[in-house]
Structures are given as C-alpha cells and as structure tokens.
From Swiss-Prot:
This is HTH-type transcriptional activator RhaS. One of its GO terms (biological process) is positive regulation of DNA-templated transcription. The gene is rhaS. PROSITE patterns: HTH_ARAC_FAMILY_1 (PS00041), HTH_ARAC_FAMILY_2 (PS01124). Its main location: cytoplasm. It holds the Pfam family AraC_binding. Activates expression of the rhaBAD and rhaT operons. It comes from the Bacteria. It comes from Salmonella typhimurium (strain LT2 / SGSC1412 / ATCC 700720). GO terms for molecular function: DNA-binding transcription factor activity; sequence-specific DNA binding. Residues 191-212, 239-262 bind DNA. Keywords: Activator, Cytoplasm, DNA-binding, Repeat, Rhamnose metabolism, Transcription, Transcription regulation.
Length: 278
C-alpha cells in the first residue's frame, strides 16, 4: 500500500497545515499517510473507499481522514478536491481541544463524511484562499494567524454540517443524500421522499442532478451497485442474495446494470478478476 509522507507535502518541518488542491483528482490507489487530512469536494463525483467502505462523493462532501485511515478514489468524473493537510493535534502552538470540533469515533463507528451546502462551500473556498496567502513566516503573529484560519475552517464545517441541521433546499438535499446512504436497499418512492424532506419533486430532481450529474433513480442505482460490489468482495453471500440485499428485485437485471456500471460482471468481481487493474 502506498504511504504518503508529510515531508513531501508540508512547506517546512514545522508547518502544521498545508493546502493541496487536486483539480481534478484522478482515480488513485489505496493509500494512507502520516498526517491528517480534510478532503473538501469542490464539484464532480466519484467513489471514495474509506477503510474498505464505499461512499459516493460529490460537491459539498467533506471527509475527515486520520493518520491511520486508508482510502482510495475510483470512478471519478471531473472530481475536484481541495485537501487541507494537518500534521497532528499537538503540532499547533496556539490551538488546543481541536477534537471537540472534529468527528469522533464512538462504539467503532467513525462519522468520517459530512456534507455542507453550496453557500458554505463558497465560504470554505474563501478561508482556504486566505490560508494559501498567509505566507510561511515563523514569527508568533504569523503562526497564530495561520492557526486561527484553520480553527475558523473547523468551526465553519462543524456548524454547517448535517450535525447542526439546516432548512434551506441545499441542506435538505444533503440530508436526503445521507438518508439514501442508510436506506438504499428499501423501495424508494421519490414523491414520498421529497415530501419527507420538504422538497418539491421537481426541486429534488433538479438539485440532485446539479450535485451529482445523475437523475435520482440513476444515483440510487449507482449507490446500490457500489454497496453490492463491496459485498461481492467482502462477503460470502450469493450474487442473488446480494442483489436482493441491495434493493434489486431481479438478479438478472442487477447483473446487467452491474456490468454496465463497472465493465465487470458480479462473478468477475467475486473471483477478483478486476484486482489486476485496481
């Protein structure tokens, strides 16, 4: 597995934060690093496999990667990221208690992926721009200024994430997409889902297409197929059982959609034939 080292990314041996844009981010094999990372998805779509679990990411996704996490990107489509790298909580001179602003693992579950709306994403861009222009002076005021900007970024993300709730259409769509991550295997009536999240059906279709480039049903199918591929690789369930577990009522239809999405059949994935090009 590829290991990325801080010496290759941080401007100096003492700098606690670095900005690393990926415009665009191509598919990238599984790796981990000796620093922490906040991944901000500007736009585009892709699959982020995080500690073996697949997530569909799009503009507004924010992922918190710790120094022991492993992850990779695949099936990227114009995926543009801004990575805010930071060494460790004890690398800062003026900041303490950062863990209170970061997602925390509880009972083995780590809420690594948050979502923010487009208005907040614009504020994030402005803060990142200030961080990039802050210079690399090591006198106390310069260091404090850079650390303050990093703290402002964490506060903005924390306040604006799904954890804090919101009422505008962007936030409602973010909540809907998070709901689909947990309920993808259920029969989905888009009219009922739109009503559940206080969106008109037309707004749901338009905004989901703007965020992901996919219609609602196409997005749901991709989500189901990604989850199915994970089960094919990491479980002993039959192809038919996996199809049903992931919301497909017909295993033949599932196999057709699967091959169309990944250019491999479910059986190919089960037998590891795709591993050669991973």
């Amino acid at each position: 597995m590829t290991v990325l080292h801080s010496v290759d990314f941080f401007p100096s041996g003492k700098a606690p934060v670095a900005i690393e844009p990926r415009l665009p981010q191509a598919a990238f094999p599984e790796h981990h690093h000796d620093f922490h990372e906040i991944v901000i998805v500007e736009h585009g779509t892709g699959i982020h496999v995080f500690n073996g679990q697949p997530y569909t990411i799009s503009g507004g996704t924010v992922c918190f990667v710790r120094d022991h996490d492993r992850h990779l990107y695949e099936h990227t489509d114009n995926l543009c990221l801004t990575n805010v790298l930071w060494r460790s909580p004890d690398a800062f001179q003026f900041l303490a208690g950062l863990d209170q602003l970061l997602p925390q693992e509880q009972d083995g579950y780590y809420p690594s992926h948050w979502r923010v709306n487009q208005s907040v994403l614009q504020q994030v861009r402005q803060l990142v721009g200030l961080m990039e222009r802050a210079g690399d002076g090591m006198d106390a005021p310069a260091v404090a200024n850079r650390e303050i900007l990093f703290m402002q970024l964490l506060v903005l993300l924390r306040r604006s994430s799904l954890m804090e709730g919101a009422t505008n259409n962007d936030a409602k769509l973010n909540q809907l997409m998070a709901w689909l991550e947990d309920h993808f295997a259920e029969e989905v009536c888009w009219e009922a889902v739109a009503e559940q999240f206080s969106l008109s059906l037309r707004t749901l279709h338009r905004q989901l297409k703007q965020h992901t480039g996919l219609t609602p049903q196409r997005y749901l199918n991709r989500l189901r197929l990604i989850k199915a591929r994970h089960l094919l690789r990491h479980s002993d369930h039959s192809v038919t059982e996996i199809a049903y577990r992931c919301g497909f009522g017909d295993s033949n239809h599932f196999s057709t959609l699967f091959r169309r999405e990944f250019n491999w059949s479910p059986r190919d994935i089960r037998q590891g034939r795709d591993a050669i090009i991973q």
